[in-house]
Amino acid sequence: MTLLFPLIASEGGFGINLNLFETNLINLVIVIGVLYWFLKGFLGGMLERRRETILKDLQDAEKRLKTATIELSKAQEELSAAQQKAEKIRLDGQARAEAIRADGEKRTIQAMAALKQDALADLTAEGARLTEQLRREAALSAIDKALAELPNRLDSKAQAKLIDSSISNLEDV
């Protein structure tokens, strides 16, 4: 066999190549080729499944994005409607407050007018009462004065004449 190796090596046939770089390169090409040949189906299937999973996830994400966009637009519409309703309520509240304020002012003016009328009525009544009291006092004073002077001025003839005239006045009535 020793004779065979030198002959084959000298003839360019099979032999042992001791050049480390050439042999590693050849071995590496052989290993990569074998791995490619055997793992092509396994890695290809795994990568295909991964690609399908990623595509499915992307489609799901797009669906969720569309759904979220639709829900966002609905929420924005509802927010806009709620803001409009809140503005309407605020304006109604302001109008109601203004109406209440105006009504309060009107009632205050009416109450003040009523107080003024009551004060004038009280003043008029008090004036009438005082006038009546002064008349009574004047009449009583005049009667007292007349009664005080009457006995001195009336004698029995004048007294009889006064009584007769008073009786005749009463009969006419």
UniProtKB/Swiss-Prot annotation:
Membrane topology summary: Single-pass membrane protein
Keyword entries, A-Z: ATP synthesis, CF(0), Hydrogen ion transport, Ion transport, Membrane, Thylakoid, Transmembrane, Transmembrane helix, Transport
Transmembrane region(s): 25-45
Superkingdom, taxonomy of origin: Bacteria
Pfam families associated with the record: ATP-synt_B (PF00430)
Major location (coarse): membrane
A GO cellular-component term linked to this record: proton-transporting ATP synthase complex
Location relative to the cell: Cellular thylakoid membrane
UniProt keyword annotation of Repressor present: no
GO molecular function, one term: proton-transporting ATP synthase activity, rotational mechanism
CDD domains: ATP-synt_Fo_b
PANTHER family: ATP SYNTHASE SUBUNIT B, CHLOROPLASTIC
Family statement: Belongs to the ATPase B chain family.
Subunit structure of this chain's protein: F-type ATPases have 2 components, F(1) - the catalytic core - and F(0) - the membrane proton channel. F(1) has five subunits: alpha(3), beta(3), gamma(1), delta(1), epsilon(1). F(0) has four main subunits: a(1), b(1), b'(1) and c(10-14). The alpha and beta chains form an alternating ring which encloses part of the gamma chain. F(1) is attached to F(0) by a central stalk formed by the gamma and epsilon chains, while a peripheral stalk is formed by the delta, b and b' chains.
Function of the molecule: F(1)F(0) ATP synthase produces ATP from ADP in the presence of a proton or sodium gradient. F-type ATPases consist of two structural domains, F(1) containing the extramembraneous catalytic core and F(0) containing the membrane proton channel, linked together by a central stalk and a peripheral stalk. During catalysis, ATP synthesis in the catalytic domain of F(1) is coupled via a rotary mechanism of the central stalk subunits to proton translocation. Component of the F(0) channel, it forms part of the peripheral stalk, linking F(1) to F(0).
Protein name (record): ATP synthase subunit b
Source organism (scientific name): Synechococcus sp. (strain CC9311)
Gene designation per UniProt: atpF
